[in-house]
Amino acid sequence: LVALALSQTAYSQITNGTTGNPIICLGHHAVENGTSVKTLTDNHVEVVSAKELVETKHTDELCPSPLKLVDGQDCDLINGALGSPGCDRLQDTTWDVFIERPTAVDTCYPFDVPDYQSLRSILASSGSLEFIAEQFTWNGVKVDGSSSACLRGGRNSFFSRLNWLTKATNGNYGPINVTKENTGSYVRLYLWGVHHPSSDNEQTDLYKVATGRVTVSTRSDQISIVPNIGSRPRVRNQSGRISIYWTLVNPGDSIIFNSIGNLIAPRGHYKISKSTKSTVLKSDKRIGSCTSPCLTDKGSIQSDKPFQNVSRIAIGNCPKYVKQGSLMLATGMRNIPGKQAKGLFGAIAGFIENGWQGLIDGWYGFRHQNAEGTGTAADLKSTQAAIDQINGKLNRLIEKTNEKYHQIEKEFEQVEGRIQDLEKYVEDTKIDLWSYNAELLVALENQHTIDVTDSEMNKLFERVRRQLRENAEDQGNGCFEIFHQCDNNCIESIRNGTYDHNIYRDEAINNRIKINPVTLTMGYKDIILWISFSMSCFVFVALILGFVLWACQNGNIRCQICI
C-alpha cells in the first residue's frame, strides 16, 4: 500500500505539471447558459450567443409616418370614390395607405360592383381620389335623380360622382349617344352604373321603355348591360339595385355611352397614376403618432429583423412573414461550459476539455502559469477574424430577406369562391415554401458559424504549436508544457506570434534530458499497481482463511463434509 501511494504521488506530480515548468493553455469563451440553435445535423446545438431573426412583437396602433395614412372611418374606398353621403371629406385626398374600417357602411342607394376587387385595387394603387369634373350633354333625359335612401343634409340625394338619368318631362328617354375623348397624358377612370328597378311599373315610370340597355365602348373594349327587373330584399327601404361598372381610357382613346334607359352616368373621371405604390389596408387599429415603416392589420412593426410572425398582411418596408415563431441565428461559437476542479489553476484546462467563462473580452485566448504567477489574455486577432465572418454573414442574410415586402389582403365575391380558394392555396403554398427556405437558410448559416469558430480555434492552436516546436510538449488538452524559463514577456511573444524558438532551444533540450529519464522510468507504476493489488488480495484472502480456522478451533464454526 505504501508503494502504491508513492507511485501515485510521483505520477500525479508529472501529469499535473508540478515540475515547475511554465504552462500555457489555449481556450475559448463560454457562458453558464448558452442558446440553443438548429443546424443541418442537429436540432439543438448550444452556442455562446445567438440573434433572434423573427419579430413577434408589434405596437397596437398604426403609425402615420413615414407612410401617409388616410382613415376611411365610416366609408370604404369604393363609397369614397362614388361620393356617398358622409364620404365627402375623402374627395381629392392622397395616401400611401388607405385605412378601411370593418365598421364602414353604405349610406346611399344599395349597389354592387361586379368586379369589386379590381376597382378597389386600381383606386388604392393610384394613391388619390383626384376627381376631374367634366361637362356632359345628356339630351332627351332628366338629370340629377335622387333617392330617399341617400340622404344628404336631411334631403334626398345621390352619389356625388354619378348622375342618375331618368325620362324627360315630356315622358321620353333619349336615346343617349355621348362621346368623350381622353386628350390628357394620363389614364382616366370612369365610374358609371346600370339601375335595376324592382318592378315593371318602376321601369316605365323612370325610363318609359319596358326594357332598357346600356352600352359603353372604347377602342379596345365594349360592355353592354340589360337591366334585371325584379323585387329584391329591401335595403334602406329600396328593393331596386344599382350595378357599378368602371372603364379605363388611355390617352388618345375615347369612351362612348349609348343608352335607351337605366344609365347611371359619370360626372367626370379619376386621374390614375401608375407610378405610385399605394395600397389599402383593412384594420380596426387606431392611428397613433408613432413612426414605423411597416404596417399590418394588427398594428405597426418596428424591427430590423428579416422575418416576422405578426401578420400575413404587411405593407411597407416589412420583414417577410414566416410561420415559425423563432429562428435563432448563431453569432457565437459552440458553448462548452467550464468544468470545475480540474486542470490549470485548479479549475480549467485547455479548449479540448471545456470553455472559459471568464474570457469576456474575446472569443479565444490564453492562460498561463510561470514563475511570475498566472494570467489570462484574449487573442483579438482570431476573435476578430471570426466576428468579421459572422457579421458579414448576418448582414448578407438581412440584406437578402429584408427587402420591401408588400402583401395585401384578397377579397372576392361569393360567386368567385373557387378563385378565392385557389388564391388562398397559392398564398399558403408561398408562405410554406418561404418558411421552409428561411429555416434551411438559417440552419446552413448556423452550421457554417460553428465550423468557422471551431476552425479559428484550431488555427490558433496550430500557430502556437508551430512556434514552440520542440521547446514544449502538447499535453493533449489544449495546453503546452514549456521546457525553459518563460517570463511574462516570453508568454506575450507566444501570444502575439513573435516567439523565436531558437533563443530557448538549448535550454529546452537540457531540461528535457533531465525530465525525460524520470518520466521514462515511470513505467514501473503499472507494475507496482498490479503487484500491490495482487498482494492486497492475497493478504485479504489469508485473513479470511485464518479467521475461519480460528473459529473452527474454538467451536464457533462447525464444518460438515457429506459424501
From Swiss-Prot:
<feature type="glycosylation site" description="N-linked (GlcNAc...) asparagine; by host">
    <location>
        <position position="309"/>
    </location>
</feature>
<dbReference type="Pfam" id="PF00509">
    <property type="entry name" value="Hemagglutinin"/>
</dbReference>
<keyword id="KW-1168">Fusion of virus membrane with host membrane</keyword>
<dbReference type="GO" id="GO:0046789">
    <property type="term" value="F:host cell surface receptor binding"/>
</dbReference>
<keyword id="KW-1165">Clathrin-mediated endocytosis of virus by host</keyword>
<keyword id="KW-1015">Disulfide bond</keyword>
<comment type="similarity">
    <text>Belongs to the influenza viruses hemagglutinin family.</text>
</comment>
<keyword id="KW-1170">Fusion of virus membrane with host endosomal membrane</keyword>
<keyword id="KW-1133">Transmembrane helix</keyword>
<feature type="topological domain" description="Extracellular">
    <location>
        <begin position="1"/>
        <end position="526"/>
    </location>
</feature>
<comment type="function">
    <text>Binds to sialic acid-containing receptors on the cell surface, bringing about the attachment of the virus particle to the cell. This attachment induces virion internalization either through clathrin-dependent endocytosis or through clathrin- and caveolin-independent pathway. Plays a major role in the determination of host range restriction and virulence. Class I viral fusion protein. Responsible for penetration of the virus into the cell cytoplasm by mediating the fusion of the membrane of the endocytosed virus particle with the endosomal membrane.</text>
</comment>
<keyword id="KW-1160">Virus entry into host cell</keyword>
<comment type="subunit">
    <text>Homotrimer of disulfide-linked HA1-HA2.</text>
</comment>
<dbReference type="GO" id="GO:0075512">
    <property type="term" value="P:clathrin-dependent endocytosis of virus by host cell"/>
</dbReference>
<dbReference type="InterPro" id="IPR000149">
    <property type="entry name" value="Hemagglutn_influenz_A"/>
</dbReference>
<dbReference type="InterPro" id="IPR008980">
    <property type="entry name" value="Capsid_hemagglutn"/>
</dbReference>
<feature type="disulfide bond">
    <location>
        <begin position="108"/>
        <end position="150"/>
    </location>
</feature>
<feature type="disulfide bond">
    <location>
        <begin position="294"/>
        <end position="318"/>
    </location>
</feature>
<keyword id="KW-0472">Membrane</keyword>
<feature type="lipid moiety-binding region" description="S-palmitoyl cysteine; by host">
    <location>
        <position position="552"/>
    </location>
</feature>
<protein>
    <recommendedName>
        <fullName>Hemagglutinin</fullName>
    </recommendedName>
</protein>
<dbReference type="GO" id="GO:0019031">
    <property type="term" value="C:viral envelope"/>
</dbReference>
<keyword id="KW-1043">Host membrane</keyword>
<dbReference type="GO" id="GO:0019064">
    <property type="term" value="P:fusion of virus membrane with host plasma membrane"/>
</dbReference>
<feature type="glycosylation site" description="N-linked (GlcNAc...) asparagine; by host">
    <location>
        <position position="33"/>
    </location>
</feature>
<keyword id="KW-0348">Hemagglutinin</keyword>
<feature type="transmembrane region" description="Helical">
    <location>
        <begin position="527"/>
        <end position="547"/>
    </location>
</feature>
<keyword id="KW-1164">Virus endocytosis by host</keyword>
<dbReference type="GO" id="GO:0019062">
    <property type="term" value="P:virion attachment to host cell"/>
</dbReference>
<dbReference type="GO" id="GO:0039654">
    <property type="term" value="P:fusion of virus membrane with host endosome membrane"/>
</dbReference>
<keyword id="KW-1161">Viral attachment to host cell</keyword>
<keyword id="KW-0812">Transmembrane</keyword>
<feature type="disulfide bond">
    <location>
        <begin position="75"/>
        <end position="87"/>
    </location>
</feature>
<feature type="lipid moiety-binding region" description="S-palmitoyl cysteine; by host">
    <location>
        <position position="559"/>
    </location>
</feature>
<keyword id="KW-1167">Clathrin- and caveolin-independent endocytosis of virus by host</keyword>
<feature type="glycosylation site" description="N-linked (GlcNAc...) asparagine; by host">
    <location>
        <position position="16"/>
    </location>
</feature>
<feature type="disulfide bond">
    <location>
        <begin position="63"/>
        <end position="290"/>
    </location>
</feature>
<feature type="disulfide bond" description="Interchain (between HA1 and HA2 chains)">
    <location>
        <begin position="25"/>
        <end position="479"/>
    </location>
</feature>
<feature type="topological domain" description="Cytoplasmic">
    <location>
        <begin position="548"/>
        <end position="563"/>
    </location>
</feature>
<feature type="disulfide bond">
    <location>
        <begin position="486"/>
        <end position="490"/>
    </location>
</feature>
<keyword id="KW-0449">Lipoprotein</keyword>
<keyword id="KW-0261">Viral envelope protein</keyword>
